[in-house]
Amino acid sequence: MAFVDQATIEMKAGNGGDGIISFRHEKFVPLGGPFGGDGGKGGDIYFIVDEGLRTLMDFRYNRHFRAKHGEKGGTKGMTGASADDLYVKVPAGTIISNADTNQQIVDLTENGKKFLIAHGGRGGRGNMRFATPSNPAPEISENGEPGETLKVKLELRVLADVGLVGFPSAGKSTFLSVVTAARPKIAAYHFTTIDPNLGMVQLPDGRDFTIADLPGLIKGASKGVGLGFEFLRHVERTRVLLHMIDMSEESGLGIKPFEAYLQINQELKSYDPRLLDRPMIIVATKMDLPSSKANLEDFKQELANRQINMPIVEISSVTQTGTKQLLLKVADLLDKTPRMIERKEEQSTDDRLYEFKDDHQSTDFQIEHEGDDWIIVSERISKLAKMTNKTTDESLRRFARQLRSFGVDDKLREAGAKDGDMVYIDGADFAFEFEE
């Protein structure tokens, strides 16, 4: 089963409930007047970080999320019930972007963090709200405001203290299964790990930390070869790297350990040079095999020849030799490693990196001409058309006045529209009548 760390979903917040037209019909109230209430607010949609989630697998088959609509208003001026908000759960480390522009909206790294992604529409006003001294009994009401619609891209980057890097079959999955309660799939082929696996290490002295066994890296990963981009996205989120190198001759990769070390570092550098600034420990794996000791000596000599001073820990996950020593060394390194990277990422969760453009407030519009028909293109005018109660003449006349105030009539006349031509706004048709 392939790891799902990206998904594109569509979200539709709830529409506001419709306002209603109603009048008082009570004994001893001869001039009862308007009595129609407002509609309730539509449901908002939030993202919320759930610490129990580890992947975006839930979004493979569920890609459409719709909040409920508000209830319509009632008589006696009663406001309709507002709809419940919809909460969409995502794992920590999820980055939300606009799918159409690829602009980042928010980076969710903190458990329990919630973020409002789509606003529900306000309730339409009932006829009580339109009463004036000159029109004390209006037959005007509004439909509910449409809820926001948005297509977003989700991208998960694993959050862990320690990341295991190395070629496939370097022993990362076996190591993780030995030192944590994680149970990754393990096999003797070169793409052992497809899914990032997280495990928690708990030491006898009370210290603990998380380890991520990430998809195996191959040459060309920084250019997207194999699982490269997926792997490197996750590496960005780790504080300490364990560079796992198979010291045996049974990996089947056909390259020496030092060459493997150089290739992995080159891929990390090509993707982001800052990755090589992370604290790193070289882990010599499979030291229980016959050829490993000699290969390790050659490896150390290559490091010395290039004046590379890097800590090395020898382990065998099969015999569990050296694993405790390695974990203590990692814990000590984490204690000394500033948490600047994490703080920077957490700070970004409080900053709105993307500003929603509210086209509904702009009075700009475009006019398109097809034969004797005219089409008005405008976010705000389309919204007003949706909110117009087209069952009453007064509501339609109010909408016509709004169009004139935006200059639509004048622009249509300038463009050549004649009385009786059909004007289409958001699928609804109106006969054009120019008023002097």
UniProtKB/Swiss-Prot annotation:
Class of the enzyme per the UniProt entry, highest EC level: hydrolase
Subcellular location: Cytoplasm
Subunit structure: Monomer.
Residue spans crossing the bilayer: none
Major subcellular location class: cytoplasm
Biological role stated in the UniProt entry: An essential GTPase which binds GTP, GDP and possibly (p)ppGpp with moderate affinity, with high nucleotide exchange rates and a fairly low GTP hydrolysis rate. Plays a role in control of the cell cycle, stress response, ribosome biogenesis and in those bacteria that undergo differentiation, in morphogenesis control.
Entry's EC annotation: 3.6.5.-
Name of protein: GTPase Obg
Binding-site positions, GTP: 166-173, 191-195, 213-216, 285-288, 316-318
Ranges of residues in domain Obg: 1-159
